[in-house]
């Protein structure tokens, strides 16, 4: 996409991630919008509105980060865990365009909160862990930072600043209906090779300050507007630049990897006595998938067949 407005843009970019670069500013980014996929993931749970909203934001953030992976089998996991927080655990992951996520929380304590609930009110003291698993390269990277700031986006920026030392801007938004969520990630490219100053060590670099100033003009309703094509959104933000290179959109889908064989393989790791202790009054070991809420009832005969 050049700096002129695209003549023919897609009607909407629901359930897609679009990567882009601004070569003259040494910046790269991703913009994501979720629609039906978000509904599909949330429909597996009966979450109250505040919990559904924070999970929606986390799913968008996971898509923004996961779509950076170049390895098809690579996996990105976002995990927020707290000490005595209303939200005990939030987990989302991305692999090959597929998203899933869930939240464990205290319903009674949530109901006691006032209507305005910031990040600290929901999580209290906790941490954000972001893990990149790259099986082809046999590598695993994990960064852990405190859950700080008033939003999940602020916590993500803290992760990039502290763990990767890459100047980054993250914005996340959920529309009033809760059925559409969007987000944008913009970073200053760490271009330096050995012997050169790496751009990401200069947090006050004028190129980054310029890009960040433009990106900060984005509105929440632009990110979550299903009628606004993502390329048009990028043009609105950066049309004064010499060039914006938009990449082919990456389709996103709900993907849960639970199945009978996987559950069976997990249970088979337990000894026979432990397996018998798990059997319920109906004669089954029932295993719930927290991601998609499916229940797998397995008898001992099926387990040991």
Could you describe each region identified by the protein language model?
Residues 2-247:
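Interaction interfaces in information-processing and related assembly proteins
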Residues 212-305:
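Cys/His-clustered metal-coordination modules, chiefly Zn-binding fingers
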